[in-house]
Amino acid sequence: MFESTEGRRPPPEVIARLDAMFERVYPASTPESAALLERICSWSRAENQAAGQRLAAIGELDTLRLRQYGERETWWTDTWDSISAEIAAALQISQAQASSYLNYSRAMRNRLPKVGSALVSGDISYSAFQTIVFRTDLIDDAEVMAAVDTALALRVQRWPTMTRGRLAAAVDRVVARADRDAVRRRRKQQASREFSIWDGGDGLSEVHARLFATDAHAVDARLNALAGTACESDPRTLQQRRADAVGAMAAGAERLQCRCGQPNCSAGASPAPGPVVIHVVANQSTVDGAAPDPGAIVGTDVLIPAELVAQLADSSRLRPLVHPGEASPERGYVPSRTLADFVRCRDLTCRFPGCDCPATEADLDHTIPHSQGGPTHASNLKCLCRQHHLIKTFWGWQDQQLPDGTVIWRSPSGQTYVTTPGSALLFPSLCAPTGEIAPPRQRDRVADRTAMMPRRRRTRAENRAKYIADGRRHNRAVRQARQSAQQAASPGPAPPDDPDDGPPPF
C-alpha cells in the first residue's frame, strides 16, 4: 500500500528546507545560550587566574619564610615541610597537595616565569601549566630553561585545544630542540609495575596489580593451593575462597580457615596468626551481632557492615577497648598498651589539620610536653604522624587539647584550626571527656630545641639534582643506543641537518 523509501535519500533542497524550518522552531544559537557560554568562558578564565594568583601568593609566603629561616635543608622537616604544613592547614588539604602547590609555585617563580604569567592572566589552565612544568623538569641549564620558557610562552596561547597527551607531545618538541637529554621518555614496561587498592563503600576493596609474569603465576598458584585447604563442605565458591586466601596469604597462614561449621571438619586446625594485623574498631553490640552499627578500619575510610564485623569476630583476635574515664595519669613517659590503644582508636588518624595518616602508624604525642609537667593521660595524648610531630616541635605550632580529644591548633602566622577525633561520628562514646589536667608549668622556646632536629642524609636540592641527572643519563643512553642501531642498519651518509633543529634562541 505504501511505497518503501528504504535506501533513498531526499534531495538536498528538501534537507535544506527541513533544516531551516527546524532552526526557526528550535534555534541552536540564542541570546540566552550565547550569554551562558560567555559566562562559562568568563568563569573558566577567572578560575585560571585564581590558580595563578594562588601560586603567586604561595610564592610570596615561601619567600618570606626563606628570608626568616633559610632553607634548613639538613633538617628532617625542612622549611619546605613547614610551609607546606601552613598551606595545608589554611586550605584544609593534605600535606602532599600543599607540597604540590609549593612545587608549582617555585617552578613559576624560578623556572617558567613567562609561562606562569600566562596562567596568572588566565590564558592557560592550571592543568596545562602542570603539564608544562613536568615536561620541562629535566632541563638543568638556566639559559636553556629561559629560552624554552620564552618559546613556550609564545606558543602555548596560540596552540589549539589539546588533550594532556597532545600538549605533552607539543612541549616535548620544543624541549627536544633545546636539550635532547631533557625530553621525558617512557620507561620500559617493567617500570610500570604497580599494586593498587580502591576502597569501596560496602566493606570490600578492589585490587589491581601489574606484576612480573613469574610473580603473578606464583601468586595464582598459591591462591589455588590455599583455596584447596578448606574441606568439601565449605559453602564458598572457588573464587570466593581464592579471594579470602589473599588475606590468609598476607597473614602468613599456611591454611585457609574452613567455614563448613562441622565439628569433625577434615580441613584441620585454624591457621596460625601471622605478622600482618588489620585493626578494626567496632562497638561490642556490633561484634555480638545485636546492633546494625558498622565497624571501621583504623586509618582508612572503609566502613565494615555490621554483619561482616560479626563474621570477622568469629575468627579474629578481639581486645576490649577501655575508656579511661576519670583515671589518674600514668607514671612514666610511655603510655601503657591499654591507654595507647584507647588514644589510637579515639583519634583513628594523625590529628594535624588535613592529615589522614593512620593512627597505627603515628606517634603518641604529649600535647603539654612531658618535660614541662605534661601528664601521660588521655586528655594530654594524641596521635601525630612523624612529619607533623616534628613540625609541631620545631616550627612554632602551638596546640591545646580538650578532655573530649578536640585539639585547637595555632599556626606560626596566628591562624586557628580545630580538629576533632576521627571516632566522633562513628563511636562518639570514645570522645566522652577523660578529665581535666593541670596547665603547663612553662612554655619552652622552639629555638632551644632545634639542635635535636633529626638530620637528612641528602638535602631536598641534592635529591632533585640526582633525579634530574638520572633522568638525563637515561635519556642520553636511549638516544645513543638508537643512533648506534640506526647507523648499523644504514651505514650510508648521514641525512642533512633539520633547519628547525638548531639551538636556542628559536
Stretches with model-predicted labels:
Residues 323-344, 353-383, 394-408, 413:
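Histidine-centered nuclease catalytic patch
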